[in-house]
Every structure is written in C-alpha cells, then in structure tokens.
Amino acid sequence: MTENIHKHRILILDFGSQYTQLVARRVRELGVYCELWAWDVTEAQIREFNPSGIILSGGPESTTEENSPRAPQYVFEAGVPVFGVCYGMQTMAMQLGGHVEGSNEREFGYAQVEVVNDSALVRGIEDSLTADGKPLLDVWMSHGDKVTAIPADFVTVASTDNCPFAIMANEEKRFYGVQFHPEVTHTRQGMRMLERFVRDICQCEALWTPAKIIDDAVERIRQQVGDDKVILGLSGGVDSSVTAMLLHRAIGKNLTCVFVDNGLLRLNEAQQVMEMFGDHFGLNIVHVEGEQRFLDALAGESDPEAKRKIIGRVFVEVFDEEALKLDDVKWLAQGTIYPDVIESAASATGKAHVIKSHHNVGGLPKEMKMGLVEPLRELFKDEVRKIGLELGLPYDMLYRHPFPGPGLGVRVLGEVKKEYCDLLRRADAIFIEELHKADLYNKVSQAFTVFLPVRSVGVMGDGRKYDWVVSLRAVETIDFMTAHWAHLPYDFLGRVSNRIINEVNGISRVVYDISGKPPATIEWE
C-alpha cells in the first residue's frame, strides 16, 4: 500500500472571493491536501471529510446584510483550528459575538499592520520593526466592512490606523482571523502565516508531493480498472498528456490513446505528439487524419460559437468511431482537473460557481457502457505540470502557452479554410520562434497569431499585390481573468513582421494587438 497522502487535510469554505482557489493552491504548495467547498455545507459533510483545520475564504458580500453567507455553526464546534480570511474573519467575528460595520473608507491595496500582541500565527514573522521595536507586516487589504468589536474571548493581535482589528485570535480554541489576504504575493509574509497555520497549528505533515501523488494515482487507477482496457483522447495538451503518462505507468498496453489531427493544430504538432508519445514513450496510439472532415464540417460557417460546437461535435463523432473499432474497452479516461470540478459544483443555495461546458469528450455511443477514469481530478494545473515533469515529460511542452481546445478554428477569424490555417501556422511559428530567441517567451503569459480574413495592398518588387493580414497578440496576466497587452520591444516586433512578410507567401501586413482584458478578451473569438 502507498502512504495515505490524504490523511492530513484542510477544508476551505468558499464565500466567493476571486482569490479562493489561490488559497487552496498555497495550501497544496505547503505539501498538504485540501478541498474547496461552498460555504453552505452541512455538519454531516464536515464530519465525513474530517479536516485537520478549516479556512474561511474572503468574499464579495457584506456580513451586515440580511441573508449574507455564514459559516455552518459546526465549524466553531468541531474542535479544529479555524482561520478566517477577510470576509471569513468578519463572519467569524459576527457569529461568535463580535460586531461588524460597513466602513465609509474602503481599504484596498498595500497596508502596514502593527503586531500589538503575541500570537502563534505570527510569532517571529515580520517585515520590519516600529521605532519601539514592534513587528510590522506588509499586507494586501481588500475590504469595505470592518470588525469593530471582537468576540469576548479573542484578543487583538495586530491593527492599522484604519483597521483596529487587522488580526484577531483565540489561542485556546485556535481560532484566527485576518482582515488582509495572506494568499496573494503582495502580502510578503503571507505564505509563512499559512504555513504556520497549516503545518504548526493544525499539525499537518507535508505528504502531498509530486512523487507521492503519482504513486497514489497509479495505485488508484489499478484498483479502479484492474485488467480492463482504457481509451483516452490524447490532444497533446498538458492535461491529456499527463493523464496518458499516469495511465501508461499504471496499466501499460491496456491503454489506447486516440490522437485526432483535426487540421487545426500548430505547425508540426501532430508529428511531435506521435514522436514523443509513440516513439519515445512507447504508448499505444491510434492516429486519425481528420483534417478534411473537420474542414468540410466548418465550410461556410463564420460564427465563433457555432465553429466551436462543430469542432466539438466532429471530434466526438471521430472519437466514437475509433472507440467502437476497439474490442472490450471498459473505461474512458479524461484529463478533468480540480478547477473543472469546482466550477461544475453547484451550491445548494444557488450562490454557485458558473458551470462551464468543457472541451472534453462527451456523449459516447449509448451501446458503449463505459466507466470514467479521471486521475487528475484532485489537481490544480500547476500540480499537473509538476507531476508531468516527475513523469519525464519535457519542460517546454508542459509550460507551453495555453492553446484553445478548438485550436486554429478560433484563431482564423470567420470561415476556416485550409489555405488560411496553413498561412497562420507558419506565421505563428515564426512569432513563437523569435520570442524564444529573444528570451521573451517565458516573460509573456500567452502569445499567438490571428488570421484576419481581409486583404490589404502591399508592394513586392515593382508590383502591387493584395494579400492577407495577421495580428500578433501577446499578453501578461496572473490569472487570465484580466490581462495587459505585452510591451514587446519595437525592434523585436519589426523583426517578426519582416520575417512573416518575407517568408510566408500570402501575407502582406502584420499588426500588433494592443487591447487589454477587459474590455477585449485574450482570444479574438
């Protein structure tokens, strides 16, 4: 038996903060398993999960309003440490007899909090000292309401001029509340505070490591599928690639991967996928040449959402046909990751995350009664990448910029044609190659080229000609929810433009997209 890597676990109750997933990722980075649940869980669910500690997240609502979210009262009766962050601190204060008021001054941004009383949460942790030797912490505030009276059995640990109770604590019950966000990098000692809570106060061991996660996943796959055969749609993306490697390690030749070349991939991508997984790692892969079928289905369609649906539908059709050719396949594997699971989980009160439709395989033929294998469903994307490295996948593949599920189908604006895809593939390859050469690729979060279905006049030699236009797009972002356009050097952009126009016959003009998100989205379609 492998070690129980879920033995020590933290429960995070989500009150709707944009940072809640970041809290969970930070706890995982500390080597401790955690799960993210909606705030309105039942006592029975908490008992069943049996957490070593509970974190109450921030949230956008006001505790002073009627019907605003509250932590289940059992949280404070379970006998485990509790850590309230921002809104989580406010609801803790109110539910335990303190008081919260709306504030005229919204505190948003950097603040310095002064530690005025000793606490296990921040003992020995400081950024600087006051003139009389009191510790100061540089933190990131984002709140309107504030606690104006703490519960009777709590003490004030730290304060600011505008926030008298920046940290509160009940050391006996191991309840802690902070008005700032320790999970964001702007709170410089935030990770140390989370480590203090999770590792010291909750006494969780660091059992959640890439090597142990792999051992656990392999054993669970073997227990689930036994000697049965499994099929996986391999796209060459991070999630399906790591899923393939885990399954290959667990069940070897009982895994069949179906790789569909839809004609909408990057330059030489199909060849690279086959060489890496087939030749190098020795996986059993069915390679389907589907370019013409996808292009035929897309002919005449220019609406972006319709194109996405067509690409998804045809992929499922092709995958189904290949699955039916295989004998005795009992399981379908998918690269579902933890954020997919969170976003699809609806809260009982309706204050839930938005459910999004994923570009995973759906709708297998009814005659194929298959079970589902999802070895990554507990993992965040950064954890999937770390596991991929541990399994031997190349860094450049795992840390490549995001590529949309429908591929070039949504990077060719309007109707998708083979001519447009071929031009775009070559132009995009030049842009990416030059980013690598200039050591800029890892400095931007995402970079790609878009094909515009407009002809523009150009001069070549002594003649004029009308050829196509492409746009370069590069953005910098932390979370892909908001993004700035990347300020790439002019000489670099000039070099890329010259190469594309000179080397890709059919393109006469290159433009650079300088739109931020919002109002623009990162992808054009």
UniProtKB/Swiss-Prot annotation:
Residues 9-207 form the Glutamine amidotransferase type-1 domain. Keywords: ATP-binding, Glutamine amidotransferase, GMP biosynthesis, Ligase, Nucleotide-binding, Purine biosynthesis. ATP binds at residues 235-241. Pathway: Purine metabolism; GMP biosynthesis; GMP from XMP (L-Gln route): step 1/1. One of its GO terms (cellular component) is cytosol. Residues 208-400 form the GMPS ATP-PPase domain. It catalyses: XMP + L-glutamine + ATP + H2O = GMP + L-glutamate + AMP + diphosphate + 2 H(+). It is an enzyme of class 6 (ligase). GO terms for molecular function: ATP binding; GMP synthase activity. PANTHER family: GMP SYNTHASE [GLUTAMINE-HYDROLYZING], GMP SYNTHASE-RELATED. This is GMP synthase [glutamine-hydrolyzing]. It comes from Klebsiella pneumoniae subsp. pneumoniae (strain ATCC 700721 / MGH 78578).
